[in-house]
Amino acid sequence: MEIQGTRFGTLEFDEKEIIYLNEGLLGFPLSKQFLMFPYGEDSSFFWLQSVDEPEIAFIVINPFDFFSDLEFAVEDEDASSLVLARSEDVEIFTLVTIPEGRPEEMRTNLAGPVVVNVQNRLGKQILCKDYSPRQPLIPDSMRSQLKEQARSSKGGHVAGGR
């Protein structure tokens, strides 16, 4: 199978690679089939590419790579709809937003993780009221340093005139 996307051009894939989000994502109800692939080599980021609407792609992460103290509870109803029998069959991803020109301000939606059964490729976005929908990925102290570095490199470039 293949899709023609605006971001990646032609993507060839096997049907067994599709993740099925039967309820879509919040705000994107028509996108129910997705492909997931690494953002880059050795990256903690992934692309979640809509098969139904090829112009739609999201950056996602495994939130446990960034936040070791997370605990997501998958309600029985959600586990049932995903046909989840074992906790080791679950993978959880969260959507990331990166403001243009301000990567140090990137955030992830911990309040709306996407839960995927890796055995049958069924997934669902669930709601977790205990977490923020705009959780910074970079700690405040490090964010300040990155902002300062960005300012100095821009300032140095402009001052140098070349």
UniProtKB/Swiss-Prot annotation:
Keyword annotations from UniProtKB, A to Z: Bacterial flagellum biogenesis, Chaperone, Cytoplasm, Translation regulation
Cystine pairs: none
Location (main, coarse): cytoplasm
Biological-process GO terms, alphabetical: bacterial-type flagellum assembly; regulation of translation
Any one Gene Ontology cellular component term annotated for this protein: cytoplasm
UniProt-annotated location(s): Cytoplasm
Gene3D superfamilies referenced in this protein's UniProt entry, alphabetically: BH3618-like
Subunit structure: Interacts with translational regulator CsrA and flagellin(s).
Protein purpose: Acts as an anti-CsrA protein, binds CsrA and prevents it from repressing translation of its target genes, one of which is flagellin. Binds to flagellin and participates in the assembly of the flagellum.
Family: Belongs to the FliW family.
Protein name: Flagellar assembly factor FliW
Species of provenance: Magnetococcus marinus (strain ATCC BAA-1437 / JCM 17883 / MC-1)
